[in-house]
Structures are given as structure tokens and as C-alpha cells.
From Swiss-Prot:
Coiled coil: none
Keywords: Amino-acid biosynthesis, Cytoplasm, Histidine biosynthesis, Isomerase
UniProt pathway: Amino-acid biosynthesis; L-histidine biosynthesis; L-histidine from 5-phospho-alpha-D-ribose 1-diphosphate: step 4/9
Pfam families: His_biosynth
Gene Ontology terms describing biological process: L-histidine biosynthetic process; L-tryptophan biosynthetic process
Lineage of origin: Bacteria, Pseudomonadati, Chlorobiota, Chlorobiia, Chlorobiales
Location(s), subcellular: Cytoplasm
Protein name: 1-(5-phosphoribosyl)-5-[(5-phosphoribosylamino)methylideneamino] imidazole-4-carboxamide isomerase
Gene name in the database record: hisA
Record HAMAP family: HisA (MF_01014)
Signal sequence segment: none
EC number annotated for this UniProt entry: 5.3.1.16
Main localization, broad class: cytoplasm
Swiss-Prot/TrEMBL catalytic activity: 1-(5-phospho-beta-D-ribosyl)-5-[(5-phospho-beta-D-ribosylamino)methylideneamino]imidazole-4-carboxamide = 5-[(5-phospho-1-deoxy-D-ribulos-1-ylimino)methylamino]-1-(5-phospho-beta-D-ribosyl)imidazole-4-carboxamide
Length: 260
């Protein structure tokens, strides 16, 4: 199972939210590119980058920050957040982004997804479904759609979408464990390749998700748990302090025994 570290960008900084609540924003580093370097040093094979400002406004506010990450790293970068036009997709792919994530637009403008899949490979265009109790949320999780999560997935499947990034937002940023049953239910009904997201906080969560590989769950996006050093043998503190020398939430005071 592929583990994909997440980088959320708000007002140019690397942040994490709790259940998508912008009022519960925690800044980890001022420069998201520095965070990307840390995850690459941790042997990340792909990064999931989200422009949170764009998710709210539809404007590519943090485009240059994302460009910097793409230019610095030698691994695929997946980008989401407020991508609602063919032009936005073209702009991201033109700078070397490997995969774009269509979220709200899959609900509000499904013809966009159809148009994109006529022009690009399915591996380049994926759909993100962020669900609360089975109902997709859109526009930065501020509005609900009028269908169930699996119904949206099946509609996207008809258009040629092959992969869904599925986020259980009741778990996102909570560090309270993955929504195993919710993800299992969705994966069984969708019958597609699934990247799981939301709530992963321990290695036990990863083992649970791995048991869903037979239903198409082959990868997982992890955010806050990595930032809080919840996994044994994370060496990001060493890489951070020795090579980057940046002050911030990542400090010696926050070291854990497993990270030494």
C-alpha cells in the first residue's frame, strides 16, 4: 500500500486543519517546499498537495508555492483544491504536476470531468469525494451534495474515472483512527481504485486499510499523524534540524523517543 504524505497550503504556509475547519488551523512551516523536502527525505514516493485557499475561492492562490514543490522534487505530485476548469488543469499539468484532483466540480459540473477525460489519461484525472456520514461535501466542505458518496462514485465511473480519493471528514485531522467501516462500505459499492484519507493515526490503522486492498484500496493519504510523529522510526526531526535549520512547530522540544 502506497503511503502519500499530505501538504495543505493556506495563505502560503504549510498547515493542518481539524475536520476541515479553517478556524482550527495549525501552521507547521512557513514554506511548504521545506515540508516537501522533509517528506522526500522520509522516502515518500508521492505527495498530495492541496491549495486550501483555492478550495474556498476557486482561484489558484498558491500556484507558485506548488510550482516550487514540483520543481524541487523528483517524485509525482498530486494536486487538489478548487480545480474547477479545464484551464486550471492545464496550468497544473504544464508545470509537471502528475495528477489533478477534481472535487466540488465533480458534483456541480460533471461535464468538466467528461471533457478532461477526453483530453487526458485517467491516471492524470482523479476525483476526490469528501464525505460526512456518506454525503459528499463541496466548496471547502461548506455545502452538502444531494446524493450519496457511492452514487457519485458510480456516476464518475460511467464517465471513465478510474480512481477515487475518499476522505471520511468526520475523521480528518482528529487522530482518532481511520473510518474503517465507512471506507469499506464505500469501496465495496464503488468497485474502483481507492485512495483512502482521513483519520489514520497509528500503524494499526494502516493494517486495517491494507485488509481492504481486495476492494481496491491501494493507497492512503496521511496528514496530521505524520506531522505529529505518530509512527515509529520517523527521522524527519533529524533531517529537519540538521539540514534545513528552520524554526517552527518542528522543534527539539517536540521530539519523541521513536524519532531519535
Amino acid at each position: 500500500m502506497l503511503i502519500i504524505p499530505a501538504i495543505d497550503i493556506k495563505e502560503g504556509k504549510c498547515v493542518r486543519l481539524t475536520r476541515g475547519d479553517f478556524a482550527q488551523k495549525k501552521i507547521y512551516l512557513d514554506n511548504p517546499a521545506d515540508m516537501a523536502i522533509i517528506w522526500r527525505k522520509q522516502n515518500a514516493k508521492m505527495l498530495h498537495v492541496v491549495d486550501l485557499d483555492a478550495a474556498l475561492t476557486g482561484e489558484m492562490v498558491n500556484f507558485e508555492k506548488i510550482r516550487e514543490i514540483v520543481e524541487l522534487l523528483d517524485i509525482p505530485i498530486q494536486v487538489g483544491g478548487g480545480i474547477r476548469s479545464v484551464e486550471a488543469v492545464e496550468k497544473y499539468l504544464s508545470i509537471g504536476v502528475s495528477r489533478v484532483v477534481i472535487g466540488s466540480a465533480a458534483v456541480t459540473n460533471p461535464s468538466l470531468v467528461a471533457d478532461l477525460l477526453k483530453k487526458y489519461r485517467p491516471s492524470q484525472i482523479v476525483v476526490g469525494i469528501d464525505a460526512e456520514h456518506g454525503v459528499p461535501k463541496i466548496k471547502g466542505w461548506t455545502e452538502s451534495s444531494n446524493m450519496q458518496d457511492y452514487e457519485l462514485a458510480l456516476e464518475m465511473k460511467k464517465l471513465g474515472v478510474e480512481r477515487i480519493i475518499y476522505t471520511d471528514i468526520t475523521r480528518d485531522g482528529m487522530l482518532q483512527g481511520v473510518g474503517y467501516e465507512t471506507t469499506k462500505r464505500f469501496a465495496e459499492k464503488a468497485g474502483m481504485k481507492i485512495t483512502a484519507s482521513g483519520g489514520v493515526s497509528t500503524s494499526d490503522d494502516l493494517h486495517k486499510l491494507r485488509s481492504l486492498e481486495r476492494f481496491g484500496v491501494d493507497s492512503v493519504i496521511i496528514g496530521k499523524a505524520l506531522y505529529e510523529c505518530n509512527f515509529p522510526c520517523q527521522e524527519l526531526w533529524y533531517a529537519y534540524e540538521q539540514d534545513l535549520g528552520i524554526d517552527g512547530e518542528f522543534s527539539t522540544a517536540r521530539k519523541k523517543e521513536c524519532c531519535r
